[in-house]
Amino acid sequence: PDFNKIKKLIEVMTGILQDKLYIEQLNEAISLSEKTETGKYAPFFSLSNIKGEKITRSSEDFKKKNLLINFWASWGDSISNHQSNTELKEIYQKYKKNKHIAMLGISLDIDKQEWQDAIKRDTLNWEQVCDFGGLNSEVAKQYAIKQVPSNILLSADGKILAKNLKGEQLKKKIEEVVTAAE
């Protein structure tokens, strides 16, 4: 949704119209979306990986690196997930030894076994984390994730560089970021 346009429309409404529950929900969605705009610092998170270890944005594997975060779920649209995973596997193969970028999968699954099965089935070899809260999880709210798959590219200092790039746009942006860091 075009949150800027919605925000302007809400601002011109009279008081009683602004008191509606739907308007409150829209304002909350706008507020969350604004917190994850390009150029803002990404929210902190701490989630468990498949081994039960706590992973944060500042974990050792991600320190001083740009970070591509992919939000996904085993229950997501299989065609979109498959296409996204294929692109991500190509990116991972190309950059897995690069010291300027890392990848992290944040699953919005609610079932641990389905999450683990999807990681194996789809051969997602980069770090994967999940809190089993689905789209209602804290991390989904913090990053204003409303659908999967989604992605966010962070700079080495934690600023949001780009959101929801796909295909060639994503590959080009990563190449640009890695080249600038070298």
Regions found by a protein language model. Name each.
Residues 1-57, 65:
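Oxidative protein folding and maturation machinery
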Residues 57-62, 140-143:
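Short amphipathic alpha-helix with an adjacent loop that forms part of the alpha/beta core around
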Residues 63-65, 71-89:
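Conserved redox-active cysteine motifs that mediate thiol-disulfide chemistry
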Residues 63-67, 98-101, 124-125:
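Loop/turn elements at helix/coil->beta-strand transitions in domains of secreted/extracellular proteins
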Residues 68-69, 103, 151:
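Hydrophobic beta-strand anchors of alpha/beta hydrolase catalytic cores
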Residues 72-75, 115, 126:
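Signature tryptophan residues that serve as conserved aromatic anchors
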Residues 80-122, 134-140:
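Structural microenvironment flanking redox-active thiols in thiol-disulfide oxidoreductases
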Residues 124, 131-179:
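Thiol/disulfide oxidoreductase modules built on the thioredoxin-like
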